[in-house]
Amino acid sequence: MAKKESFFKGVKSEMEKTSWPTKEELFKYTVIVVSTVIFFLVFFYALDLGITALKNLLFR
């Protein structure tokens, strides 16, 4: 039981040392991540359409 208590005390100690982002930073980083995901989604969708069209053109 002492090991468990020691573990959770260590976890609490490390969590207090953590630098958490502000609401503004969190929002900013979330927008960046979502924008990047959408960009790559559109990019790879367009690439897939292009490769499919090229394949259909070559192998009619």
Curated annotation (Swiss-Prot):
Disulfide bonds: none annotated. Keywords: Cell membrane, Membrane, Protein transport, Translocation, Transmembrane, Transmembrane helix, Transport. One of its GO terms (biological process) is protein secretion. GO terms for cellular component: plasma membrane. One of its GO terms (molecular function) is protein transmembrane transporter activity. It is found in: Cell membrane. The chain crosses the membrane at residues 31-51. Coiled coil: none annotated. It is a single-pass membrane protein. Its main location: membrane. PANTHER family: PROTEIN TRANSLOCASE SUBUNIT SECE (PTHR33910:SF1). Component of the Sec protein translocase complex. Heterotrimer consisting of SecY, SecE and SecG subunits. The heterotrimers can form oligomers, although 1 heterotrimer is thought to be able to translocate proteins. Interacts with the ribosome. Interacts with SecDF, and other proteins may be involved. Interacts with SecA. HAMAP family: SecE. Belongs to the SecE/SEC61-gamma family. NCBIfam families: secE_bact. Essential subunit of the Sec protein translocation channel SecYEG. Clamps together the 2 halves of SecY. May contact the channel plug during translocation. This is Protein translocase subunit SecE. The gene is secE.
